[in-house]
Amino acid sequence: MVSTTVDLNSKIPNNVGLSDDVKLKRALESWLPSYLEWWNDMGPSDFADKPVFLRTAVSVDSDGWAHYEHVKMPDYRWGIFLNPREGESTIRCGDEVGKPAWHEVPGEHRNALRRIIVTQADTEPASVEQQRLLGHTAPSLYDMRNLFQVNVEEGRHLWAMVYLLHKYFGRDGRDEAEELLQRRSGDPDKPRILGAFNQPCDHWLSFFAFTMFTDRDGKYQLAALSHSGFDPLSRTTEFMLTEEAHHLFVGETGMDRIIKRSAELEKLDPDGDIRRAGGIDFDLIQRTINYWFTYSLDLFGGEISSNAADFFATGLKGRYREDRYEEHKAMGATYRLPVVENGHLGERDVPLRNAMNEVLRDSYVTDCERALRKWNRTLEESGSPTRLTLPSRRFHRHQGIYADHCFDPQGNLLDRSRFEANQRNWLLTPADNEYLLSIMKPVYEPGKFANWIAPPNKGIEGRPVEFEYVRLND
Amino acid sequence: MDSAPQQQPPVEFETDPSRYRHWQVSFDGPIARLKMAVDPAGGLRPGYELKLNSYDLGVDIELADVVRRLRFEHPEVRVVVLSSGTDNVFCAGANIHMLGMSTHAWKVNFCKFTNETRCEMEDATAFSDQIYIAAANGTCAGGGYELALACKEIYLQDDGNSAVSLPEVPLLGVLPGTGGLTRLVDKRKVRRDRADVFSTTAEGMRGKRAKDWNLVDGVFARSKFEQEVMKRAQAIAAAPIKLLPGERRGVTLGPITPELAAHARLYRHVELSWDREARTAQILVRGPSAADVAVVTAGDEAIHAAGDQLWALRAFRELDDALLQLRTNHLDIGLVLLRTEGDPAQVLAHDAALAASREHWFVNEVLRHMARVLRRLDLTSRSFFALGDVVGNGMPAFAGCLLELALAADRFYLLDEPAVQVGLSALNEGALPMSHGLSRLAARLYGEPDKFEALVGQRGLMDAEAADDAGLVTVRLDGIDWADDTRMAIEERSSLSPDALTGMEANLRFVGHENETSKIFARLTAWQNWIFIRPNATGPEGALSLYGKPQRPHFDWNRV
């Protein structure tokens, strides 16, 4: 254990009055060394001494939340920010809608809030762990920088959640914060809580798919929590959303650039054989979409859920853009859900509150469909006849009411043997991963890109694409 | 919905391994593996899914069968490792949706049966050298932790997530009613202030703290869990102990398939019949024949060879089934008349021979089984009148182990006629204890220790007058009074409030001190049953009623 005494307030940019909060300061002081130890063990491997052109949030002002400079990652200043509020916050949904929001954890909701925060918090370090080796195969310095930006911000999101645990949950919160650094993605002994965060993410196609699909779950969870009646959670997650947008940008444009490049290679090769041209063929891209989209769907939880109903009823978690709904109690209404009954697909009406996970999943699926349309436009513009699709949300599920049944990507019920016979056509296979690893050689020269991906349209923060986003020779 | 369980076909309690839907049993020498893998679609009643290894009565009927068969059919087993066949979930406890939609009576019967099953596990650990260890390879919540608590040792997977918990109070507004609270403080000796914290912390406790608070006996990392648990199982299996003698050849429990009549279930040695109009039932038990007695007097090997056809085993299995039938499928029967038929001298001869062989493992199992069935009788919430009169051509046979029926009953009417005789055997003196440890004879004569002392060691038969003088008889009637007096007593009893009678009988039957088991069936169960009918649990806005529904519960904050 490293022992450090630091001037926390200059080290940790914040707008939570850290310097005056003795209790919080003490908690963070004892947590910080463990965090740094975790970052050194489980954060990006080998690039600790390289300056990276990173965005750091130093305040919540419009010019302060995105401060760019070259920083070595261990020196990154992980801060704690709450979105400012004007006027009195209120509870936004459920039975108590309109009443003043909570500024402390109400004892009645301690367990539910703790569960919500710990589950969200656990995903943040998990993705850093999953991506720790990717720097070694980065297709460009631009992409490497984006990877590291995502990593440090996921680290900051862990800070944001740990702040809530330290500040509002007493000793139990401190214990949970410590546990967050003990669990490890994919570790057989101490796995991360949610399935998708234990899946290997060992090449860049998975990285882009992960930031596209899995981080997008994060966006919707954070958006739902930004309508929480627990004011500190609401304000923290609102600020996290501003950073999360970049992660989604990395994923969505990364996939788009691969698709664009594959379409180019398809034309370049006389037989249209993308692999022979060293690229990633569309079937493999489709299998990747199928794999990560469906694992990410699981993260929303059960289709019929008493927890979801409780969280909404108590005002702890709203819907996506709850403020755009006219009615915030959602009592008496129902949600029509496709269900498997007696071996057939039918429909069932469930109380809307119990279907809140599915309501959030709907918003997410709509967003993913938008991205797919964009990628297909890229294909169209490139003159490729291929079109990519999102699989049915029933396909390849490990949680919820569809998990015990087999479906094809169109959502038709199948028997298990037919599913297994077709699995390699639908989902990533070990051979796919081998192929991807074989073509993923690092490209560290500024402005150059790996053969399998197109350059971006523009650089970061007005810098050109050729900019030295990571100074590897310093 | 509320009366759904009663409109369904009657529940049958007999099962066998070929019919299990929820449990997997495997054997490796002295170690048995018992895996809970509940079939979500296998609920006993429609309307709920048994998700996350949650259980209903059907799951527990199979568990009770497993526990019983392990004792009789697998005497080579020393350790039973109880784990889950479902990844990351050990057992989520009783199915809440099932409880939410059940009638009060169904809930009470369900809890009673599950409690009895858990006591059977402890009984097997204590008296059959079959030690249960819980290998909680995942979350162990509510009834799931209570199931683990019934094991002698509990091990929890340490994966940063798996916890043991009793979330009933904070989440459902009811108690952990399967012995959880009692075993926490009485059996595991968890400090009561910590038990208070634990029982109100919905998420429970995991890892080191669970161990420090003695909620579990050990925690092992996930990758080593199986290996460490099996190491512990092997150590227990290898520990030298003095086993009861007798060839450790299992005795298969064949079906007891009764013949079903319109108003009766006819077994080989037992008859259950009922009169819905009069709200009474009768259980008639026939004593051992001369041939049955010949088997037991021939000694250990002959008894072992008789297997499940042995009178003492067969008759009490039948009696057990009859009691369970009454409890679950005949809710409107308030009074049960207990009659016996046979030769009381043969019963005494039988008992003497069985007692002489009691060191043989199989005889030990037979006696323990008889004791459990009699405890089931003690704990049955029906009025019991034992009637010692002439049945057809036969004489009543209230002697020895069958006298226990009269001593378990709330009243014992005995016909005063020279041919009617009762008698004591060695089995009346502690071999068949009640759940709080007293013999029924000691409980009956709790306030008259002199009479009790006078009876201890007394063998042979006595007539009605002597039995009355000895304090064994409630009402002695001659042939002239018998018919009218018993008719009036039966009718009067049948007219009283069933709730008041249940409470009264449960109080009067268990005189003397309490122990852990009796506290579970008295204190814990009584409070639970009260909570079950309170609006805060089962009213339209109660926590149990609304669990999983979109509405939130509302409590009446007044303490009662």
PLM features: residue spans?
Chain B
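Conserved hydrophobic packing residues within short motifs/helices of P-loop NTPase cores
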Residues: 80-81, 133
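Hydrophobic, small-residue-rich alpha-helical packing segments that form membrane-like cores
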Residues: 93, 98-105, 109, 113-131, ...
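Proline/glycine-anchored alpha-helix kink/cap motifs
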Residues: 125, 372-375, 442
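CoA-thioester-processing core
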Residues: 141-196, 393, 399-454
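C-terminal alpha-helix plus adjacent terminal tail
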Residues: 1-61, 65-78, 84-92, 98, ...
